[in-house]
Curated annotation (Swiss-Prot):
GTP hydrolase that promotes the GTP-dependent binding of aminoacyl-tRNA to the A-site of ribosomes during protein biosynthesis. The keyword Phosphoprotein does not apply. GTP binds at residues 19-26, 81-85, 136-139. Belongs to the TRAFAC class translation factor GTPase superfamily. Classic translation factor GTPase family. EF-Tu/EF-1A subfamily. Its EC number is 3.6.5.3. This is Elongation factor Tu. The lineage of its organism: Bacteria, Pseudomonadati, Pseudomonadota, Alphaproteobacteria, Sphingomonadales. One of its GO terms (cellular component) is cytosol. Its main location: cytoplasm. Residues 10-207 form the tr-type G domain. Monomer. GO terms for molecular function: GTP binding; GTPase activity; guanosine tetraphosphate binding; translation elongation factor activity.
Length: 396
């Protein structure tokens, strides 16, 4: 039989399974592909193939991640599943696998466990917009009351991390039953109910072109007779010739007008997210703009120097530091296209941070950077990456 090609005519969404070790994340991932394969929306991927996820290196960090894809009647999904807890931490902090939403898997017999909490906290810190819960292994619990208690506990836990615990859909079932094709009421039916909840509850992410215009500046040229050209890859939005933009970061914010957009030496009327362009800007001298700043739609983003962040510190094996760092550590923070020196404030009660740790840090930069919550960065020492982080809260 010829392999059916996925038609990309449905909206696309990136999701993943999160939760405590052995609560059934990988079994659930396999079960989703099995149930949807029967409906023509996936290729079945068995447990073993998801579990032996290949190692990938993302910005020098070793992460094992399995990727499967499938579709429901409404959407096309790319789904990530990680074999180990450390892989989740790294994945969520580096944004190696962007998640527009996640399925939190909780074993009904155990209830929430330490990594359940940690994954919910990480999801909150790195800005995963929505969670749906799958209460797994319900056939191992005889007492309906216990299921109700576990559900209550999960909802309270979600609320304590600022997720809408009362509203989040919780689907009960057995991923193994679905995978083995038995007990449809807790097997296949629960998978269909879960996917319906994911379709309905996880919001469709805005396309990059629908967001406000932002382009990190990579290079600046002066073209005689024409003026100053800045080059870079448009991160989000659309820029049309004649529109006003702000130049933000490192120095005081300046306003200018884009008088020309060119790509591959051709003049265009507009550039959009993903395009590598040169933008001709009016009335700005070459020395007034530099790499590390951004061009952005006026009012859409502001420069900041102080923030807190969720950070993963590379282990020695990953080429990171061999020794811990302490309070007043001053590395470089690499945002988009440039390094800015910053000072680290450790959380209350933390004396030092070891290679391989993940930690919440407060940072004070010596120069402002255009940032929003959710912005990713690398921590570097003399050009070598020693950590990866995401802005979780802007303080100044």
């Amino acid at each position: 039989m010829a392999k059916a090609k996925f038609e990309r005519n449905k909206p696309h969404c990136n999701i993943g399974t999160i939760g405590h070790v052995d609560h059934g994340k990988t079994t659930l991932t396999a079960a989703i592909t099995k149930v949807l394969a029967e409906q023509g929306g996936a290729e079945f991927t068995d447990y073993a193939n998801i579990d032996k996820a290949p190692e990938e290196r993302e910005r020098g960090i070793t992460i094992s991640t399995a990727h499967v894809e499938y579709e429901t009647a409404n959407r096309h999904y790319a789904h990530v599943d990680c074999p180990g807890h450390a892989d989740y931490v790294k994945n969520m902090i580096t944004g190696a696998a962007q998640m527009d939403g996640a399925i939190l898997v909780v074993n009904a017999a155990d209830g929430p466990m330490p990594q359940t909490r940690e994954h919910i906290l990480l999801a909150r810190q790195v800005g995963v917009p929505a969670l749906v819960v799958y209460m797994n292994k319900v056939d191992q619990v005889d007492d309906e009351e216990i299921l109700e208690l576990v559900e209550l506990e999960v909802r309270e836990l979600l609320s304590s991390y600022d997720f809408p615990g009362d509203d989040i859909p919780i689907v009960k079932g057995s991923a193994l039953a679905a995978l083995e094709g038995r007990d449809d009421n807790i097997g296949k039916d629960s998978i269909n109910a879960l996917m319906a909840a994911v379709d309905a509850y996880i919001p469709q992410p805005p396309r990059p072109t629908d967001k406000p215009f932002l382009m990190p500046v990579e290079d600046v040229f002066s073209i005689s007779g024409r003026g100053t050209v800045v080059t870079g890859r448009i991160e989000t939005g659309i820029i049309k010739v004649g529109e006003e933009v702000e130049i933000i970061g490192l120095k005081d914010t300046q306003k200018t007008t884009v008088t020309g957009v060119e790509m591959f030496r051709k003049l265009l009327d507009q550039g959009e997210a993903g395009d590598n362009i040169g933008a001709l800007i009016r009335g700005i001298k070459r020395e007034e703009v530099e790499r590390g700043q951004v061009l952005a739609k006026p009012g859409s983003v502001t420069p900041h120097t102080e923030f807190s962040a969720e950070v993963y510190v590379l282990s020695k094996d990953e080429g990171g530091r061999h020794t811990p760092f302490f309070a007043n550590y001053r590395p470089q923070f690499y945002f988009r296209t440039t390094d800015v020196t910053g000072e680290v404030v450790l959380p209350e009660g933390t004396e030092m941070v070891m290679p391989g740790d993940n930690v919440t840090l407060a940072v004070k930069l010596i120069a402002p950077i255009a940032m929003d919550e959710g912005l990713r960065f690398a921590i570097r020492e003399g050009g070598r990456t020693v950590g990866s982080g995401v802005v979780s809260k802007i303080t100044k």
